[in-house]
Amino acid sequence: MAVERTLSIVKPDATRRNLTGKINARFEEAGLRIVAQKRIRLTREQAEQFYIVHAERPFYGELVSFMISGPVVVQVLEGENAVARNREIMGATNPANAAPGTIRKDFAESIEANSVHGSDSLENAATEIAYFFSGTEIVG
Protein backbone atom coordinates (compact mmCIF):
# COMPACT_ATOMS: atom_id res chain seq x y z
CA MET A 1 0.00 0.00 0.00
CA ALA A 2 1.19 3.47 -0.84
CA VAL A 3 1.38 6.40 1.55
CA GLU A 4 -0.47 9.26 -0.12
CA ARG A 5 -1.55 12.80 0.61
CA THR A 6 -4.97 14.25 -0.11
CA LEU A 7 -6.72 17.56 0.44
CA SER A 8 -9.66 17.88 2.79
CA ILE A 9 -11.81 20.95 3.31
CA VAL A 10 -14.13 21.27 6.29
CA LYS A 11 -16.88 23.38 4.74
CA PRO A 12 -18.70 26.43 6.20
CA ASP A 13 -21.72 24.43 7.42
CA ALA A 14 -19.43 22.31 9.59
CA THR A 15 -17.18 25.12 10.86
CA ARG A 16 -20.29 27.13 11.79
CA ARG A 17 -21.42 24.23 13.99
CA ASN A 18 -17.95 23.71 15.52
CA LEU A 19 -17.57 20.22 14.03
CA THR A 20 -13.92 20.50 12.96
CA GLY A 21 -12.66 18.54 15.97
CA LYS A 22 -15.20 15.75 15.50
CA ILE A 23 -14.36 15.54 11.79
CA ASN A 24 -10.62 15.53 12.51
CA ALA A 25 -11.15 12.69 14.98
CA ARG A 26 -12.77 10.62 12.21
CA PHE A 27 -9.69 11.08 10.01
CA GLU A 28 -7.28 10.21 12.81
CA GLU A 29 -9.30 7.20 13.99
CA ALA A 30 -9.13 5.89 10.40
CA GLY A 31 -5.33 6.12 10.39
CA LEU A 32 -4.92 9.39 8.49
CA ARG A 33 -2.55 12.03 9.85
CA ILE A 34 -3.24 15.75 9.53
CA VAL A 35 0.11 17.06 8.28
CA ALA A 36 -1.09 20.59 7.47
CA GLN A 37 -4.15 22.57 8.52
CA LYS A 38 -5.35 26.16 8.47
CA ARG A 39 -8.64 27.95 8.98
CA ILE A 40 -9.28 30.52 6.27
CA ARG A 41 -12.05 32.49 4.64
CA LEU A 42 -12.02 31.96 0.90
CA THR A 43 -12.42 34.96 -1.37
CA ARG A 44 -14.87 34.68 -4.24
CA GLU A 45 -11.92 34.53 -6.64
CA GLN A 46 -10.26 31.69 -4.70
CA ALA A 47 -13.48 29.67 -4.60
CA GLU A 48 -14.20 30.29 -8.29
CA GLN A 49 -10.71 29.19 -9.28
CA PHE A 50 -10.68 26.16 -6.97
CA TYR A 51 -14.00 24.89 -8.36
CA ILE A 52 -13.33 25.99 -11.97
CA VAL A 53 -13.87 22.40 -13.17
CA HIS A 54 -17.55 22.90 -12.30
CA ALA A 55 -17.87 26.31 -14.01
CA GLU A 56 -20.31 25.03 -16.64
CA ARG A 57 -22.44 23.09 -14.16
CA PRO A 58 -25.74 24.63 -13.00
CA PHE A 59 -24.73 24.51 -9.32
CA TYR A 60 -21.41 26.39 -9.76
CA GLY A 61 -22.64 29.81 -8.60
CA GLU A 62 -24.37 28.40 -5.53
CA LEU A 63 -21.31 26.29 -4.67
CA VAL A 64 -19.00 29.31 -4.84
CA SER A 65 -21.40 31.43 -2.75
CA PHE A 66 -21.68 28.67 -0.15
CA MET A 67 -17.91 28.18 0.08
CA ILE A 68 -17.38 31.90 0.82
CA SER A 69 -20.27 32.10 3.31
CA GLY A 70 -18.02 31.35 6.29
CA PRO A 71 -14.63 30.02 7.33
CA VAL A 72 -13.31 26.72 6.01
CA VAL A 73 -10.53 24.50 7.33
CA VAL A 74 -8.17 23.30 4.61
CA GLN A 75 -6.07 20.26 5.48
CA VAL A 76 -3.56 17.85 4.07
CA LEU A 77 -4.21 14.28 5.17
CA GLU A 78 -1.50 11.64 4.87
CA GLY A 79 -1.72 7.87 5.11
CA GLU A 80 -2.07 4.56 3.31
CA ASN A 81 -4.27 5.10 0.25
CA ALA A 82 -5.28 8.49 1.67
CA VAL A 83 -7.38 9.58 -1.32
CA ALA A 84 -9.65 6.52 -1.29
CA ARG A 85 -9.65 6.27 2.50
CA ASN A 86 -10.75 9.89 2.89
CA ARG A 87 -13.53 9.44 0.33
CA GLU A 88 -14.72 6.37 2.23
CA ILE A 89 -14.73 8.31 5.53
CA MET A 90 -16.59 11.25 3.93
CA GLY A 91 -19.33 9.15 2.35
CA ALA A 92 -21.41 9.85 -0.77
CA THR A 93 -21.69 13.46 -1.96
CA ASN A 94 -25.43 13.34 -1.33
CA PRO A 95 -25.82 12.68 2.41
CA ALA A 96 -29.09 10.86 1.71
CA ASN A 97 -27.02 8.22 -0.09
CA ALA A 98 -24.12 8.17 2.38
CA ALA A 99 -23.46 5.10 4.49
CA PRO A 100 -24.15 5.23 8.24
CA GLY A 101 -21.12 6.33 10.23
CA THR A 102 -19.68 8.53 7.46
CA ILE A 103 -19.05 12.24 7.95
CA ARG A 104 -21.71 13.28 5.46
CA LYS A 105 -24.37 10.93 6.85
CA ASP A 106 -23.69 12.09 10.41
CA PHE A 107 -23.05 15.83 9.91
CA ALA A 108 -24.19 17.11 6.48
CA GLU A 109 -27.19 19.40 6.20
CA SER A 110 -27.80 18.92 2.46
CA ILE A 111 -26.11 17.88 -0.78
CA GLU A 112 -24.57 21.38 -0.97
CA ALA A 113 -23.86 21.84 2.74
CA ASN A 114 -22.30 18.38 2.98
CA SER A 115 -19.61 19.33 5.53
CA VAL A 116 -16.45 18.20 3.69
CA HIS A 117 -14.60 18.22 0.38
CA GLY A 118 -11.99 15.63 -0.51
CA SER A 119 -9.75 15.19 -3.53
CA ASP A 120 -11.07 12.58 -5.97
CA SER A 121 -7.72 11.41 -7.39
CA LEU A 122 -4.01 11.52 -6.64
CA GLU A 123 -3.52 13.97 -9.52
CA ASN A 124 -6.22 16.32 -8.25
CA ALA A 125 -4.91 15.95 -4.70
CA ALA A 126 -1.49 17.24 -5.77
CA THR A 127 -3.06 20.22 -7.58
CA GLU A 128 -5.47 21.01 -4.73
CA ILE A 129 -2.80 20.74 -2.03
CA ALA A 130 -0.53 23.11 -3.97
CA TYR A 131 -3.45 25.55 -4.31
CA PHE A 132 -3.61 26.05 -0.53
CA PHE A 133 -0.22 25.04 0.88
CA SER A 134 3.45 25.66 0.19
CA GLY A 135 5.82 22.76 0.76
CA THR A 136 7.13 24.30 3.98
CA GLU A 137 3.61 24.34 5.49
CA ILE A 138 3.28 20.56 5.25
CA VAL A 139 4.96 18.91 8.22
CA GLY A 140 5.00 15.12 7.97
UniProtKB/Swiss-Prot annotation:
UniProt-listed SUPFAM superfamilies: Nucleoside diphosphate kinase, NDK
Molecular function (Gene Ontology), one example: ATP binding
Compartments, as annotated in UniProt: Cytoplasm
Domain of life of the source: Bacteria
Alphabetical UniProt keywords: ATP-binding, Cytoplasm, Kinase, Magnesium, Metal-binding, Nucleotide metabolism, Nucleotide-binding, Phosphoprotein, Transferase
Signal peptide bounds: none
Subunit field text: Homotetramer.
UniProt protein name: Nucleoside diphosphate kinase
